[in-house]
């Protein structure tokens, strides 16, 4: 899908689509819950969750939620600049940069996030909980810890030129 405002192609990945049941006096009422990841393949990625009585409506709601939740992650040469560990509840995600040609070595939800983000080479390990929503949230917590060269130079009180030599 092409985003009309920025003319960027968006990558949409469905993480999970669950049929949930509510038991009422007259019987069971079914609805759907969708969890999606959206990215542009150039460093912007977001997740969204939507619930509706129809599966397609739940997916649409999760897409709009994901587009509102887009954030930028610094990518360098098709991978992250350094190793990070993200934790959310009991889910822990370890993400390591990899050399060119390694590919995306990651489990289900983390793989979908990395593909939507535009990362081509990464090593990842999901530890603890395997709940897909918590694993994705732990991945996004890890993205909050990623530092780019400008942030490192600013923290050290140096310019980029003196930092890189």
Swiss-Prot record:
Single GO cellular component term: small ribosomal subunit
GO biological process: translation
Residue ranges of domain S5 DRBM in the record: 10-73
Cystine crosslinks: none
Pfam families: Ribosomal_S5 (PF00333), Ribosomal_S5_C (PF03719)
Keyword presence, Plastid: no
Keywords: Ribonucleoprotein, Ribosomal protein, RNA-binding, rRNA-binding
Molecular functions (GO terms): rRNA binding; structural constituent of ribosome
Tagged with keyword Heme: no
The organism's place on the tree of life at top rank: Bacteria
Role description: With S4 and S12 plays an important role in translational accuracy.
HAMAP family per UniProt: Ribosomal_uS5_B
Complex and partners: Part of the 30S ribosomal subunit. Contacts proteins S4 and S8.
Family label: Belongs to the universal ribosomal protein uS5 family.
Domain remark text: The N-terminal domain interacts with the head of the 30S subunit; the C-terminal domain interacts with the body and contacts protein S4. The interaction surface between S4 and S5 is involved in control of translational fidelity.
Name of the protein in its database record: Small ribosomal subunit protein uS5
């Amino acid at each position: 899908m092409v985003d009309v405002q920025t003319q960027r192609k968006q990558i949409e990945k469905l993480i999970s689509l669950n049929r949930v049941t509510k038991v009422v006096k007259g019987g069971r009422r079914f609805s759907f819950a969708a969890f999606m990841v959206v990215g542009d393949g150039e460093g912007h990625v977001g997740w969204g969750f939507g619930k509706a009585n129809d599966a397609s409506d739940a997916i649409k709601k999760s897409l709009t939620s994901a587009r509102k939740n887009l954030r930028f992650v610094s990518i360098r040469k098709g991978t992250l600049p350094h190793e990070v560990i993200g934790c959310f509840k009991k889910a822990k995600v370890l993400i390591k940069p990899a050399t060119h040609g390694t590919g995306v070595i990651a489990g289900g939800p983390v793989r979908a996030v990395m593909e939507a983000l535009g990362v081509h080479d990464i090593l990842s390990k999901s530890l603890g909980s395997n709940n897909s929503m918590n694993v994705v949230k732990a991945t996004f917590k890890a993205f909050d810890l990623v530092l780019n060269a400008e942030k490192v130079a600013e923290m050290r009180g140096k310019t980029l030129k003196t930092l890189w030599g």
